[in-house]
Amino acid sequence: MSALCPLLTPPASEALLLAQARQLSGYTLGELAAMAGITTPKDLKRDKGWIGVLLEIWLGASAGSKPEQDFAALGVELKTIPVDSLGRPLETTFVCVAPLTGNSGVTWETSHVRHKLKRVLWVPVEGDRSIPLAERRVGSPLLWSPSEEEDRQLRLDWEELMDMIVLGQVERITARHGEVLQLRPKAANSRALTEAIGARGEPILTLPRGFYLKKNFTQALLARHFLLQNP
């Protein structure tokens, strides 16, 4: 059996990507970091994206923070998801930054959200705060595309939220809007403002917003897969 090592180039097929992701299952983050020659931080307070970066290294991801998918040649996006001991998501999942201007003519079919969620490699990771970061284990991966019903749910929420943005109501949107998709501020500090449309159609400055999948959506998705896999 060959020794486990990070992919130095992007995987050439979904099968190779999934095979590599499956090999990581059961390892701790500390073990994977040590084998990849990178330091494990004490916690994620200042390194929020560290787990994603670690898995990108192991899986040969290419996109970084660019708008295309992490595995652009395959059209696959990588999403790590912290879960509790029962495999339930512990937080919402960031999808992409929301465009607050220039949205005339935009449709669900051509949206960034749909593009990012067309094909996703979900990698659950132990997220219980009581487990030291280095000791948290990587779970079994799932390669997923939205079902017709999931696509419909996402589209309805996206259309409602985009209508509010276009109509100058971005400041009225709360995390409670949307059944499975929410829009909320995404900024490291409250001084990072971006242009948006105000209630009277005037340009305003507001916090950047991001689209996030709600926990009920990802929980149902993971439960369906892993319950089918482990009857």
Curated annotation (Swiss-Prot):
Highest taxon, organism lineage: Bacteria
One record GO biological process: mismatch repair
Keywords attached to this entry: Cytoplasm, DNA damage, DNA repair, Endonuclease, Hydrolase, Nuclease
Any GO MF annotation of the entry: DNA binding
Subcellular localization: Cytoplasm
GO CC annotation, single: cytoplasm
Pfam families: MutH
Similarity comment: family membership: Belongs to the MutH family.
Protein name (database record): DNA mismatch repair protein MutH
Organism in which the protein naturally occurs: Salmonella paratyphi C (strain RKS4594)
Highest classification ranks of the organism: Bacteria, Pseudomonadati, Pseudomonadota, Gammaproteobacteria, Enterobacterales
Gene: mutH
